[in-house]
Amino acid sequence: TLFPYTTLFRSIKSALEEDFGLPVTVANDANCMTLGEVWVGAAQGCTDVIGVTLGTGVGGGILTGGRLLEGARGLGGELGHYRTHALDGVDCTCGAKGCWERYAATTALVRAAQEKDPAWKDGRAIFAAAEAGNETVLALLDAWTDEIAQGLAGMVHIFNPQLILIGGGVSAQQKLLIEPIAAKVKASVMPAFAEGLEVRAAQLHNDAGMVGAVYYFRQTMEKE
């Protein structure tokens, strides 16, 4: 469950401040990814952004009106647990059913691919097969990007972002991932929401979270 995390964050923050005698902030890694990209990456100059990381799960960060959406207890932005298949979905590790990350994470793609061919053991192998024109893999990718796009379309109708950022190891796949997601999201939302909407790959890769953590710390200190 997510709920003990706020207590854990406070405990870590207090312990580190006591040990080092310095101010400490604790933030969600996907939130930090989004902030890093806004500060010096692919989302510079944007005020309304949905950042999504695809990997073992789905992480996310939402910037609205130039401010990170954290919620009342700092738990906002858990996009992976947006329930896209609430009525008939598979079990999620959080205890609910039908969470988006069970369908949109890279691990969901790998699970589906492994049922077809054990050699497709990770994203790299799957995309290599897709680039070689394997029709089975291309069909799997089409179904997977459908799941990603449908979740994003719902969020677009709620937050009306100007930019959707896709992060994670697979985000380098422009033609096989980013472009299909962009087309499907725009086709799935009301026309006014699609106008001006961009979908881009994150630029900072593994550094995004660290860069965003610095930015989060600076913002927190400025508020205080």
Predicted regions and their residues:
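Short glycine-aspartate micro-motif
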Residues: 49-53, 59-61, 91-93
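ATP-binding/phosphotransfer module of carbohydrate and carboxylate kinases, centering on a glycine-rich
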Residues: 13-22, 36-46, 68, 86-224
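Active-site glycine-centered loops adjacent to acidic/histidine catalytic or metal-binding residues
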Residues: 29, 55, 213
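Adenylate-forming
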Residues: 34-39, 60-62, 81-83
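General beta-strand structural signal in soluble alpha/beta enzymes
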Residues: 24-28
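Structural signature of FAD isoalloxazine-binding scaffolds in flavoprotein oxidoreductases
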Residues: 9, 75-79
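Short, small-residue-biased leader/transition segments that mark boundaries at the very start
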Residues: 1-8
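Catalytic-core segment of enzymes that process non-peptidic bonds
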Residues: 59, 63-70
